[in-house]
């Protein structure tokens, strides 16, 4: 780098020296460019301290060392041509360090310019070297200031200021006297804002996502569930046990499963977007469109018993087949803390309302203070059924509309009371901390370890 700077300074110095010398050479070229036949008047003055008049014959100084006595005291002029005075350049007069031009012709006098005779070539080189050094220093200072320190100084306050103003509430130091219960409550509003900022997600302008990758994962899970359900008739035995263990009314006989179809298609999730919850603006929730175009069928048969005036007075065989052929809705999913007051109050409200109706299902689910997955469906859902019925022994009634409408309304009412907003379903999530009891390893690795030990 220093070598490049030195070479640059030398070039600048030589430029200034060449510039001083080129002014004199330019005067020679100017004279030679004049017409050869043009008369040229020359004149000189002698009342100056020192005068050089170049006619090809240099004036000689007198004994006192000056040239004044060799020249007349008055102005002289004469006529000649450029050919005769081609060696005549100009008259450079130095008087009190002020340059003076005595030209040979009025036209030349209007166009010629002389540099100061006191300026030497050595001073021109030194001047150029100094200017070169200063210019290089100025360029380096400009580059360092605006290209190295300029951007960092502007971007630093934007990144550091929030870290200075924010309290490290999640930092734990060993040996502290205060317990975690004394730490400030977690600010959900600040958390949601920071999450959106650090993930570069704008809830107002961000485009919805297709969730193709999520559909593949869900399809794999459903395929595994179907395999386990159909293996050794597991789903048949599970449903039969559930129906037989339930308390049936007196007018129903034992229920037998005649048909099971768990489908062969998969749900499609799409148009996923993150929004603020309308009930709590500090909580984020994902809204996903769900569409299921598949056939899920459950067929049963039973008997209606007429026990009056005595038991089993009359028996009416009934066969039903209910299929879900289409379901589409907007699914709302969010992660919440089960210790939130909003969650606890909503649970209590649901329990009170269901206890008043007498339809409360006590599952003995007690949620702690961990995280839970909350989901619900929008009220404008679409749920289509296909109900087939066959009633009677000898004279049979097939597909009675009244029975189909009754069953469809009952199923939709069951779905509304459990999964449709403002009600929701809650799934408690396991702890994210690794535990020894949850650790697993492949069977092959265990066998290889046993072989190596032997």
From Swiss-Prot:
What membrane topology is annotated for this entry?
Answer: Single-pass type I membrane protein
Q: Where in the cell is it found?
A: Endoplasmic reticulum membrane
Keyword Translocase applies? no
Q: Which UniProt keywords apply?
A: Endoplasmic reticulum, Lipid transport, Lipid-binding, Membrane, Transmembrane, Transmembrane helix, Transport
Where, by residue number, does the polypeptide cross the bilayer?
Answer: 129-149
Tell me the residue ranges located in the Cytoplasmic compartment per UniProt.
150-454
PROSITE patterns in the cross-refs: SMP
Recorded GO CC terms: endoplasmic reticulum membrane; ERMES complex
GO function terms (MF aspect): lipid binding
Which InterPro entries has this protein been placed in? Mmm1 (IPR027537), MMM1_dom (IPR019411), SMP_LBD (IPR031468)
Topology Lumenal: residue spans: 1-128
Pfam families per record: MMM1
For this chain, the annotated S-S bridges are: none
Keyword presence, Protein biosynthesis:
no
Q: Where is the SMP-LTD domain?
A: 207-430
Task: Extract one GO BP annotation from the record.
Answer: mitochondrial genome maintenance
Which superkingdom?
Eukaryota
The free-text domain note is: The SMP-LTD domain is a barrel-like domain that can bind various types of glycerophospholipids in its interior and mediate their transfer between two adjacent bilayers.
Q: Which PANTHER family match?
A: SMP-LTD DOMAIN-CONTAINING PROTEIN, TEX2 PROTEIN-RELATED
Record's subunit section: Homodimer. Component of the ER-mitochondria encounter structure (ERMES) or MDM complex, composed of MMM1, MDM10, MDM12 and MDM34. A MMM1 homodimer associates with one molecule of MDM12 on each side in a pairwise head-to-tail manner, and the SMP-LTD domains of MMM1 and MDM12 generate a continuous hydrophobic tunnel for phospholipid trafficking.
Provide the family line: Belongs to the MMM1 family.
Function text: Component of the ERMES/MDM complex, which serves as a molecular tether to connect the endoplasmic reticulum (ER) and mitochondria. Components of this complex are involved in the control of mitochondrial shape and protein biogenesis, and function in nonvesicular lipid trafficking between the ER and mitochondria. The MDM12-MMM1 subcomplex functions in the major beta-barrel assembly pathway that is responsible for biogenesis of all outer membrane beta-barrel proteins, and acts in a late step after the SAM complex.
Q: What protein name applies here?
A: Maintenance of mitochondrial morphology protein 1
What organism is the protein native to?
Komagataella phaffii (strain GS115 / ATCC 20864) (Yeast)
């Amino acid at each position: 780098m220093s070598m490049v700077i030195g070479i640059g300074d030398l070039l600048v110095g030589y430029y200034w020296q060449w510039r001083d010398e080129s002014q004199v050479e330019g005067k020679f070229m100017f004279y030679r460019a004049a017409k050869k036949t043009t008369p040229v008047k020359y004149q000189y003055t002698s009342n100056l301290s020192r005068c050089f008049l170049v006619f090809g014959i240099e004036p000689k100084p007198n004994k006192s060392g000056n040239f004044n006595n060799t020249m007349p005291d008055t102005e002289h002029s004469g006529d000649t041509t450029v050919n005769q005075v081609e060696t005549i350049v100009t008259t450079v007069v130095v008087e009190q360090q002020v340059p003076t031009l005595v030209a040979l012709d009025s036209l030349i006098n209007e166009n010629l310019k002389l540099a100061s005779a006191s300026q030497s070539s050595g001073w021109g080189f030194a001047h150029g070297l100094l200017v070169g050094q200063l210019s290089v220093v100025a360029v380096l200072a400009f580059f360092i200031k605006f290209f190295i320190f300029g951007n960092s100084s502007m971007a630093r306050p934007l990144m550091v200021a929030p870290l200075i103003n924010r309290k490290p509430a999640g930092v734990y130091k060993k040996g502290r006297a205060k317990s975690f219960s004394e730490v400030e409550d977690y600010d959900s509003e600040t958390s949601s804002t920071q999450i959106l900022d650090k993930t570069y997600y704008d809830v107002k302008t961000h485009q919805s996502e297709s969730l193709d990758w999520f559909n593949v994962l869900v399809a794999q899970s459903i395929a595994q569930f179907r395999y386990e359900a159909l293996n050794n008739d597991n789903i048949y035995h599970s449903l039969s046990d559930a129906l037989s263990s339930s308390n049936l009314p007196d007018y129903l006989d034992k229920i037998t499963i005649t048909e099971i179809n768990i489908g062969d298609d998969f749900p499609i999730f799409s148009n996923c977007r993150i929004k603020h919850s309308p009930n709590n603006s500090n909580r984020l929730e994902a809204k996903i469109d769900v569409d299921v175009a598949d056939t899920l069928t459950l067929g049963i048969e039973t008997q209606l018993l007429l026990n009056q005036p005595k038991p089993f007075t009359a028996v009416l065989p009934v066969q039903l087949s209910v299929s879900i052929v289409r379901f589409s809705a907007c699914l709302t999913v969010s992660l919440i803390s089960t210790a939130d007051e909003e969650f606890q109050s909503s649970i209590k409200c649901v329990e009170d309302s269901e206890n008043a109706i007498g339809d409360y299902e006590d599952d003995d689910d007690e949620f702690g203070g961990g995280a839970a997955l909350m989901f619900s469906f929008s009220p404008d859902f679409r749920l289509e059924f296909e109900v087939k019925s066959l009633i009677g022994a000898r004279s049979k009634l097939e597909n009675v509309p009244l029975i189909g409408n009754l069953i469809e309304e009952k199923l939709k009412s069951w779905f509304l009371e459990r999964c449709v907003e403002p009600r929701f379903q809650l799934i408690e999530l396991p702890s994210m901390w690794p535990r020894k009891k949850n650790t697993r390893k492949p069977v092959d690795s265990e066998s290889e370890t046993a072989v190596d030990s032997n």
